[in-house]
């Protein structure tokens, strides 16, 4: 029986309607359809148009119906077209025509027989069309609907493949799909469209376009995919509805994906696949899996959700989005991406065979579950580096962002203003040549930023990095860390920690480091620190603004402030022990205990304008250290304390001590103090050895006045014009040169005790 359809514009309803009449009786039925569906049936101009078509009605039957002729076909409401032969199809069409089928609401095509198929359709030019408003069902390996040579499926009803696919031990892929395209095609679903099966849509080859506004629900025991693109495929996937896959073989091993692009038999994918999501994509394993191809583009729009994982499954490695290969892949997330797993779980993963590309996040990317290696964004790569731009939020139990450039040219992370990355380690670098720019927040329970590699560049500009360690370099050389104005690094232990290597730390004016134990800690290697901002250590015991441990060397240049606020034993603005460290200070160093504490072989240059203040401003606790002071050194008890031998102090600035300006402790030998023009000393100069054998000596050079009492030194040698106005001067030297006037005039206004004095010719005492 034939039926004639008219598509007309109904002004009262504001929509197109389909009217039909039986060719034999003239009776008419009205079926309303959306304008978008009407457009699919008829190419329309801007104004409403009227078209007529006559369809051949396929009657209810239990044998295969073979299409013939060019007239469109319809399965009417109430009709069921099926086959009682399990391996055959209910409707078949060869390649003599492009077939056009309409399945009305309430109509059924296919059966529940094992391995049955609803439609097996070839096509003359690839223009075969199936519009389903009813139910299409099957259980065949080659799909409920098989499109052999292109074509389109429009689904406003229900399409299902009821087969149960068990785990194939030989990993042979199966095609238990609702729609199976051998050579490209398209699938379009309205909000009412439902597609269910082990897989939803499988594209074997060619160009395909999938637009889902309804539901694709794939539920198999293993290898279940919402949309699968295979060998040589390319095209687009647009989802405004829901794509869900769940699959488990019962042993904890699962392999399912909402979107899966890959290749079979090592065939190359000839093109690219783009994914555009503003709906929901969900999977137990990998939600969007792009495994073979190049130049992929994925957009998750505002309101879009891509999520992976299942808390009821143990030992699962879940990933919301994984791109294993591809050059210059682009991922943009404005919505929500999340993954749950107990091992190696990722929000977005760029695999080892990717090169270049950009990840842009303005939404949220989250992983939970606490598995080792978890990351919101994990980038490998083996070619050009990948760029990650974040102005949204990223959070994870392990890593927020992990950049692995062991095989690539180095990646780039731009954490922009207003953004936030949080995890046990907010950002981790493994490899060389990576670039990190932070204007937002990086918050780590352990590390805000972890670096393992060489020649990485880190710049924080107006942002904040925090953690137990703000920034930690576990190994590597040539790394450059710069904190610009407005930046803040906060830590419950150490602001910047460097384990080894030769690296550079620069903090500019307006930046701040606030930490409990160490503002900056250098454990070994030749590392340089330039501070123009503020460094503050707040701990109550053994806290340091900058600490160089044994084996560490380098140069500290301070034009800013370095402060400790606790009153614990051993606190110091700068603490250097081990290798040779040169300290150049023209800023401010302030501590309640020690300003600068050094052990052996270090150099302190307190330049003009430089200020060092503490209970003991400068402590030499070792040998062969050098102090040159042109600024101000002020100690509540001692300005400078020397405990060691072979140290030199050269002063043309100000040294103040509540008790001693300069104190040489007992057992310290062969130390030399030189006071030059411009010297201001307040407090005593004391050598606790009080022994000539200690051989600690004072040299007066240039001109000036010294009002300090002097006691215990081996000798005083004057080479210039000096006035000693202190109350006493007691020297321990046993020769006539205990007091030696080599040139100029030396005036003594106090009492002197010495074994002898030498006044050279032409000089005055």
What are these regions (language model features)?
Residues 8-51:
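Gram-negative bacterial Sec-dependent N-terminal signal peptides
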